[in-house]
Every structure is written in C-alpha cells, then in structure tokens.
Amino acid sequence: MSSCATPTSLMPHALDLANLPDADVVALALEGREAAHRELIRRYERPVFSLVFRMVRDRELAEDLTQDSFIKVLSHLDRYRSEFKFSSWLFKIANNVAIDHLRRRQLDTVSMDGSPHATTPDAVMASAIELSDASESALEEMEAKELGSAIEQAIARLRPEYRSCILLRHVEGRSYEEIATTLDLPLGTVKTYIHRARHELRPALEHTRE
C-alpha cells in the first residue's frame, strides 16, 4: 500500500458515512470506495427521482432516467468542483437527462406534488407549488390547493427550459442564483425564463380564480 494512503483511523466505516458531509463522501467515492457510492445514491435517489418524475410523468421512465443520472454522476465524479454544492451539480445532471429525453420524445407532462425532499403528506402540501411574486398580485393570491388540472396542463405545455426553472423556483424554493448554478445558465436568462413562464401560465391561473 502506498505510504500516502489514507490512515485506517481516518477511514470511516460504512455506518459512519451518513454523518459525513457530501464533499467528504465524494472524496471517498473517488478513492473507489463502493460504500461511498451507495451513500450518495441513498441520500439523493429519492429527490432525483421526484425531480425527474415531475418532468416526464411516467414512473417507470423516471426510474430509468434516475438510474441514467446516477451512472453519469458516479462516472464523472472527478469533474465535480468542491466549491459548489454537490446537490446542485447532481440536480443539473438529472435535469439535463430529463430535458434531453423530453426533447427526443417530445413529452410534455409534469407533476406538481411538492418538493422531492418532502417525506410526509404534510410536508408535500407545505412545499407544493405556489406561483407567487410580489410584483404579480394575481399569482400571489393563488394557493397550492387551487392549482388544479388547468395549471398542471399549462405547465406541461411550457418549453422544457421554462419548466425546469419554474419547478426549481416554486417547488424547490431555490433562489435565482441557485437555479442559474444548477442549470448552468446566466442569471439574466433564468429571470427571463421564469418571467416568460409566468406570463404563459397567467391565463390558466386567472381561469381558476373566482
């Protein structure tokens, strides 16, 4: 064994991986530790699946695309830059996998069931999409429970790029800056996409109001 190998005392057992930050688990995965690979999948398989499922609205397909996403992620961990959040890098890859599929198959379905991080019905309801903005009072008045099939269908008709931004902004609750990092887009482009998406959604939103 090389003299510069990680000392045994500093190498956590599999049960200890859950307490390590993402960057440390990634470092161990880069050393070839299968337990670290499994830990990354354990942490993010559900949120990645939920994100992809919202894009394609097909469970079996979402499972396949989630698997494809993790294959890409684990095969290219050496490209991850530790100054960025691992989750942002991971979601960018998963988002690109879903968008590539949508473009190829021209699918246009989406689910609005709340944040992929939600693990209980209450959490799902609390994180369900809420299209609101201080400058757009019509959207601000909408509550998640009022967003029925008309809104869901309207979002499904958005361009994949707009859809990704809307989902990350209003389902994930991410800032414009985080969306720009996740999707590898200029900040101005993200704001433009969200503005255009809201404009396209407005007729459907107004149609649901009394």
Residue ranges and their predicted role:
Residues 165-169:
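A short pre-motif secondary-structure segment
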Residues 50, 64-71, 84-96:
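Structural recognition of an alpha-helix C-terminal capping motif at a helix-to-coil junction
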Residues 41-59, 76, 155, 200, ...:
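Amphipathic, Lys/Arg- and hydrophobic-enriched alpha-helical face
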Residues 30-31, 57, 70-85, 104-106:
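Sigma70-family region 2
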Residues 78-82, 92-113, 144:
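Arg/Lys-rich amphipathic alpha helix in sigma70-family domain 2
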Residues 1-27, 31, 39, 110-161, ...:
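Intrinsic, short, N-terminal disordered tails of RNA polymerase sigma-factor systems
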Residues 26-49, 74:
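A short, charge-rich alpha-helical start-of-domain segment used by transcription regulators
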Residues 60, 177, 188:
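Residues within helix-turn-helix
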